[in-house]
UniProtKB/Swiss-Prot annotation:
EC category: hydrolase
Domain of life: Bacteria
Name of the protein this chain belongs to: 5-oxoprolinase subunit A
EC number: 3.5.2.9
One annotated GO biological process: carbohydrate metabolic process
UniProt xrefs under Gene3D superfamilies: Glycoside hydrolase/deacetylase
A GO molecular-function annotation: ATP binding
């Protein structure tokens, strides 16, 4: 069995270089919520050195709150901003002799596109118009995945190791109790359930079906490195191969 393990990088965390030795895919911040041209270049070089698949991590323009502020923007604006960010990272990747493989929206853009077909459509169109061979990563079972499929993009359905789930398969908003899982054992058990059994237990106790093609571990978490190592060990013990 294979699984992709991804992390959001280029957001100013000191653990980025070490995480790149443990994950198979990197989602690199493109300047709208975090990072800049130099951090993008550094992350791209480190990812290439470690053989890690590179993806753009576009966001709403929200550096003050790390892309976690809800915004109401016209779909055309979201299309343009997404295309702009993908292109910026794509130029750096190309200049370093690499190939960009995927796009995964960040933060509130990701969450809103999971439920809003218009936003999902704008993002999927931007990805398709830039390069239809790119993989679109989105929340498992979301509108973003459906929009990608409509544009005939390869999609990858994502689950989260350290986030709480609602009964409908969406993530618990960060403003609500249960949004983040701080207990390492609970996060590990949840991840294995999602990957091996295709199910997740919601914060209300309801089991929900999920398709896990890639697992996100947050690089800004206090125990990100230690958890990544434990997760890799758990996968190895169960003959689950981490591969992009």
């Amino acid at each position: 069995m294979n699984i992709d393990l991804n992390a959001d990088l280029g957001e100013g965390c000191a653990s980025d270089s070490e995480l790149l030795t443990l994950v198979s895919s990197a989602n690199i911040a493109c300047g709208f919520h975090a990072g800049d041209a130099q951090t993008m270049l550094t992350c791209v070089r480190e990812a290439l050195k470690n053989g890690v698949a590179i993806g753009a991590h576009p966001s709403f323009p929200d550096r003050d709150n790390l892309g976690r502020t809800a915004m109401v923007l016209p779909p055309e604006t979201v299309y343009a901003q997404t295309l702009y960010q993908i292109g910026a990272l794509g130029a750096i990747v190309q200049a370093q002799g690499g190939v960009m493989r995927h796009v995964k929206p960040h933060g509130m853009l990701y969450n809103q596109a999971a439920k809003d077909p218009r936003l999902a459509q704008a993002i999927a169109k931007a990805v398709h118009d830039y390069d239809p061979s790119l993989i679109l990563v989105g929340l498992a079972g979301s509108e973003l995945i459906r929009a990608g499929e409509r544009h005939r993009l390869v999609t990858r359905q994502e689950v989260f190791a350290d986030r709480g789930y609602q009964a409908d398969g969406s993530l618990v908003p960060r403003t609500q109790p249960g949004a983040l899982i701080h207990d390492e054992e609970q996060a590990l058990a949840q991840t294995l359930d999602m990957v091996q059994a295709g199910r997740v237990k919601s914060v209300t106790g309801v089991w929900t079906t999920v398709t896990a093609q890639t697992v996100c571990i947050h690089g800004d978490g206090e125990y990100a490195l230690a958890f990544a190592r434990r997760l890799r060990a758990a996968f190895n013990a169960r003959n689950i191969h981490v591969i992009a």
